[in-house]
From Swiss-Prot:
Entry keyword annotation includes Iron: no
Source domain of life: Bacteria
Keywords: Antibiotic resistance
Gene Ontology BP terms: response to antibiotic
Gene3D superfamilies: 3.30.460.40
Name the record gives this protein: Lincosamide resistance protein
Pfam families xrefs: Aminoglyc_resit (PF10706)
Annotated InterPro entries: Aminoglyc_AdlTrfase (IPR019646), NT_sf (IPR043519)
Amino acid sequence: MKNNNVTEKELFYILDLFEHMKVTYWLDGGWGVDVLTGKQQREHRDIDIDFDAQHTQKVIQKLEDIGYKIEVHWMPSRMELKHEEYGYLDIHPINLNDDGSITQANPEGGNYVFQNDWFSETNYKDRKIPCISKEAQLLFHSGYDLTETDHFDIKNLKSIT
């Protein structure tokens, strides 16, 4: 990896990878904010992907097969992996439950419960990208001490009409 930034090229590579695996996913985090605004607003250390938890083993195996190494293992809540060429990837398995609810394992035990309408899609660079909604992004940027980057992302989210 030339630097610590994950570019649009790596982003599209990862999105293509999830689509080729036929795994339902949503872009989250900083790249999710930028996709919602319609342009890259800042540099990114990683890509955050929420995905259908029933495919967790398949996703991890594929990522390891192409050279990703596990850096942080907080499963079933999240896992952070690093690739020398593609950079950091933060994966978050989510449960698409039969009753229509969506949950994610909480690292302290129990589950986070998400609203279905938080999982949306937007157009970015002539591509339809599943992503976490503006409302959910704003909610996820609360309840902790915000960084300068968080404040920047919130400002950009609030600029979306």
